[in-house]
Curated annotation (Swiss-Prot):
Entry keywords, A to Z: Cytoplasm, Elongation factor, Protein biosynthesis
Gene this protein is translated from: tsf
Main location: cytoplasm
Matching InterPro entries: EF-Ts_dimer_sf, Transl_elong_EFTs/EF1B, Transl_elong_EFTs/EF1B_dimer, Transl_elong_Ts_CS, UBA-like_sf
GO-annotated molecular function: translation elongation factor activity
GO CC, alphabetical: cytoplasm
Function: Associates with the EF-Tu.GDP complex and induces the exchange of GDP to GTP. It remains bound to the aminoacyl-tRNA.EF-Tu.GTP complex up to the GTP hydrolysis stage on the ribosome.
Taxonomy of the source species: Bacteria, Bacillati, Cyanobacteriota, Cyanophyceae, Synechococcales
Family membership: Belongs to the EF-Ts family.
HAMAP family membership: EF_Ts
Subcellular location: Cytoplasm
Name of this chain's protein: Elongation factor Ts
Amino acid sequence: MAEISAKLVKELREKTGAGMMDCKKALNENDGDLQKAIEWLRQKGIASAEKKSGRTAAEGLVGSYIHTGGRVGVLVEVNCETDFVARGDKFQELVRSIAMQIAACPNVEFVKVEDIPAEIAEREKAIEMGRDDLANKPENIREKIVVGRIEKRLKELTLLDQPYIRDPNISVAELVKQSIAELGENIQVRRFTRFVLGEGIEKAESDFAAEVAAQAAAAQS
């Protein structure tokens, strides 16, 4: 594999507007070939998406999804830049897909990691630091392990970091980036609420994630 220089990453960022990590991945996937990396980013819908992400998105749609049987319901607000895009089939399908994703992810509480309150991160850190498997490790090693575990745990709580139920090879964040590239507007998932019938009442649980994924697959067929 060719060595990927910072200069090459910078050049790719300037040409595509993609994020640094996306550029590094594109170059690694294409053995340092700049043109192939650009094409790879375009195929993934990442190129140019980052450039649009700073623009104001004040239009959009509040979408809903009720799972079969009425046991789980979701409301989600997804913003775009214009009413024209908000009324389009592709944007509305994106909103519905995101709502179905939320229904399938009972552990998700936030849109992105930056939305997680500091006290939750501190609580998770305290839990990890107290685990028995770290008791005999040096302090600096413990800190590194804990940082990695906390990062993983916080991502489990966020919508954008989840594997997309219709295509687990991409994340929800990548799905949104693809839509930004396709529709030519900034798109932001702003907030959501997930309702569960009888929440807080002790009862037998079923695999909602599998059910929603199956329903999504059926809708495509």
